[in-house]
Regions:
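Short aromatic-glycine-(Arg/Gly/Cys) micro-motifs in beta-strand/loop hairpins
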Residues: 1-16
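Short, mixed-charge low-complexity intrinsically disordered segments
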Residues: 15, 34-53
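A short, exposed loop/beta-hairpin motif centered on an aromatic-Gly-Thr core
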Residues: 13-27
Length: 53
């Protein structure tokens, strides 16, 4: 399991990040969309996924 940092911008162009633990990036995105209502409503607003070392 690895730590991922996911970033996105809202409609006011404010940048946000969330950290998720997951087996891969796809699972990290799934968890982020479950945890953040905005990402659930706007699933394509994610603009970065970084696997932390």
């Amino acid at each position: 399991m690895s730590h991922y940092t996911l970033g996105w911008h809202d409609q006011q162009n404010k940048h946000y990040e969330i950290g998720e633990y997951a087996d891969d990036a796809f699972e990290a995105v799934k968890h982020a969309r479950e945890d953040v209502p905005y990402l659930h409503e706007h699933p394509f607003s994610l603009d970065s996924i970084k696997k932390e070392q």
